[in-house]
Amino acid sequence: MDLVVDLGQSGARIKIDNQISQLQIAKLTTDSVVETLEKIFKLLPQAQYSNVFLSLTGLLGNVGDVAPYGKLCEKFFNADQVFVMDDGLAAYLGALGEKNGVVLTLGGGVVAVAGNNGKFGHADGKGQIFGDFGGGFWVGQQGLRRAISTLDQRDDAHDLVKLLSAELESHSKLQNKTGVDAATLCISAAKTVIQGAENGVTSAQEILKTAAKFLGATVIAAWSKVSDNTQEKPSITFLGGLSRSDFYTDLIRQEINQKLNCEYV
């Protein structure tokens, strides 16, 4: 029996044989990857798994010393083999296989992984404090910041106050407005901001247009790390929950198309 754990910044997906489930345990800045995995493993069936496959956020393309992962899987599952991969690279191989191009993953965070004839490059994936512009945390944070500033009479985004009324109520109830729950609220608010943009909310559209500029630059940066040949035509694909919005991905395509001749798959 095999176990697959896909750990991201907005949650974790678990696959045990052919059964797939979700856990609301995400990689946050307060815990290491190993600490987060231990929280997840404590909630899983304590069976013996022959193979454990770990697709992990926060590795920045370098899995480093795999011994801590092996020890953890041996402790909980007595696993025979443990396979560890950066989640961005895993996404690339799953989406493009042997094609040359860029995979932009839009979840709670952001990472672009480019591949060209066996050479790989990353852009962004720097986490919520130093990067991940255009990801779920960033989009939701921008929306809530402007709405809160409007309530404080420092801004005039009244359309966002109306749009994010439920999230603002949740914000008012937070005991710690700089902790894990606050970060989770930002990520969940991104969906509301995107829906608002799709429905014509001007301030929400402004947020996504700015985000798309960042994301376009992220894709270009990733590709430039593996190719300086302007004649090459890379394949581009988008993954992650935010990529389900055609409105958002169309904005990102517009930014990419200004600087890169590519095809979308």
State the predicted function of each range.
Residues A79-L104, K119:
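Conserved phosphate-binding catalytic cores of ATP/NTP-utilizing and phosphoryl-transfer enzymes
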Residues K99-T150:
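Glycine-rich phosphate-binding loop of actin/hexokinase-like ATP-binding domains
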Residues N78-D86, G131, C262-Y264:
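Short, acidic/small-residue loops that bind anionic groups at enzyme active sites
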Residues S10, T57-L59, G108-V111:
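Short glycine-rich anion-binding loops that position phosphate/pyrophosphate groups of nucleotides
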Residues V34, V63-A67, G136, T249-D250:
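Conserved strand-to-helix beginnings and helix N-cap segments that scaffold or border functional pockets
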